[in-house]
């Protein structure tokens, strides 16, 4: 996390001195070993799901979209959401992994091309109560445009692009939170 190994030496050290605000408390329900197994991808997925819940997204509100669903963060997000009772729509560029995503708990699998349909439109039909975006760019924009009134989108990736080109309509007209 933060800039360990990039701008702060010691990323591979057994011990390192860091500012206290960089430290994250170990969850009470996990052992040290379990918390390390989860790793960065699991931690990021957990924070993304927590973000949806903190914005009032609940299983009864509708489907949750997860982009980049076969990746590390995406696959853990699919599993966490399904375990929490959400109906998950997994978006992937690897349609051959549909059975893997269904095993994790996805109720539906869509392709990237399906998600990008009508991308020129400023808003799309309300399809999702929320989304976990691990890809960024036009995929994040489409997730925002397809989120229903009062929904939320969490974003944590930028493999497609770091920029976001979307109108303010979903935020103003639907109260979507990002």
What name fits each language-model region?
Residues 1-25:
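Glycine-rich phosphate/adenylate-binding loop and adjacent beta-alpha elements
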Residues 3, 7, 138-178:
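Glycine-rich phosphate-binding loop and adjacent beta-alpha segment
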Residues 36-112:
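Mid-domain Rossmann-like dinucleotide-binding core that forms the NAD(H)/NADP(H) cofactor-binding site
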Residues 33:
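C-terminal boundary of histidine-terminating zinc-finger modules
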Residues 129-132, 154:
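N-terminal Rossmann-like NAD(P) cofactor-binding module of classical short-chain dehydrogenase/reductase
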Residues 115-126:
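Short amphipathic alpha-helix with an adjacent loop that forms part of the alpha/beta core around
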Residues 11-12, 93-100, 162-168:
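Short, glycine/polar-rich helix-capping loops at beta-to-alpha or helix-loop-helix junctions
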Residues 13, 106, 127-129, 171:
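Local beta-strand N-terminus motif with an aromatic residue
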């Amino acid at each position: 996390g933060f800039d360990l190994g990039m701008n702060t030496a010691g990323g591979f050290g057994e011990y390192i001195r860091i500012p206290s605000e960089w430290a994250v408390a170990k969850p009470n329900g996990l052992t040290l070993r379990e918390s390390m197994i989860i790793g960065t991808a699991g931690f990021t997925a957990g924070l993304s799901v927590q973000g949806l819940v903190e914005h009032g997204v609940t299983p009864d509100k509708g489907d949750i979209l997860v982009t980049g669903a076969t990746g590390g963060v995406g696959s853990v997000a699919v599993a966490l959401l399904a375990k929490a009772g959400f109906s998950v729509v997994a978006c992937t560029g690897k349609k051959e992994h549909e059975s893997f995503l269904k095993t994790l708990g996805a109720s539906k699998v869509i392709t990237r091309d399906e998600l990008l349909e009508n991308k020129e439109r400023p808003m799309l039909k309300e399809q999702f109560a929320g989304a976990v975006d691990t890809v960024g760019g036009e995929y994040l924009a489409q997730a925002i445009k397809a989120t229903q009134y009062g929904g939320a989108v969490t974003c944590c990736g930028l493999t497609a692009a770091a920029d976001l080109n979307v109108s303010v309509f979903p935020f103003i007209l639907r109260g979507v939170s990002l």
